[in-house]
């Protein structure tokens, strides 16, 4: 009898061991994916972001910019809450190609300073993670948009969590809000998930010509 039990126990042990190995392998693969998504894609996106930012600055030196085409950078976004040197070049379009380089502008939404809803999208984690800390923005926080000739200062009014299919957040007028020049930023929520969308709204507070303030509003240097 004992000679028949030992093989049974050995088979059970092998099955348990194989199961544990599968679990460990799956865990390692998940960890590698997280590292790749959070760090490796960030590195590549940062290289692309640096290049388009440099190209945009050079373009502005050459003369008045043309109407942006899909995939082209056409302005800079500054968010002092993330650091006084935090800025990202924003591209026209919100397809994967654009968002793999930086924040993108919803093509059918308003432009900076216009009455309407100037709407942007950006990744939360990975591919540059431009909107990683958007959940830290609160009412009154400034969001500065830099174009070739103007600085626009928006002030955050609030945020909301919505379903990914809710596109009304980038429409105009915004539900329950007064008319004006609005800025909306959308990103995934929570971190490491695209189950929902974190939406941040801001209202235009002021605008100043770059000819009058070449270095930008004082709040940029102050890191307000």
Regions found by a protein language model. Name each.
Residues 11-12, 17-18, 23-224:
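Solvent-exposed, non-transmembrane regions of membrane-associated and secreted proteins
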């Amino acid at each position: 009898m004992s000679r028949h039990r030992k093989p049974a126990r050995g088979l059970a042990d092998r099955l348990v061991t194989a199961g544990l190995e599968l679990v460990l392998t799956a865990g390692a693969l998940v960890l590698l994916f997280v590292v790749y998504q959070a760090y490796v894609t960030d590195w590549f996106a940062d290289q692309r972001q640096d290049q388009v930012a440099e190209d945009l600055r050079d373009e502005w030196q050459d003369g008045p910019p043309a109407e942006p085409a899909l995939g082209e950078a056409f302005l800079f976004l500054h968010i002092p809450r993330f650091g006084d040197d935090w800025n990202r070049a924003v591209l026209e379009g919100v397809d994967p190609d654009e968002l793999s380089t930086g924040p993108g502008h919803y093509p059918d939404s308003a432009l900076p300073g216009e009455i309407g809803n100037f709407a942007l999208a950006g990744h939360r984690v990975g591919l540059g993670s431009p909107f990683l800390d958007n959940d830290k923005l609160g009412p009154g926080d400034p969001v500065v948009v830099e174009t070739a000739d103007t600085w626009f200062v928006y002030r955050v009014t609030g945020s909301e969590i919505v379903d990914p299919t809710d596109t009304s957040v980038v429409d105009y007028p915004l539900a329950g809000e007064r008319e004006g020049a609005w800025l909306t930023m959308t990103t995934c929520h929570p971190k490491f998930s695209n189950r929902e969308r974190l939406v941040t709204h801001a209202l235009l507070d002021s605008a100043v010509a770059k000819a009058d303030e070449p270095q930008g509003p004082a709040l940029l240097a102050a890191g307000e």
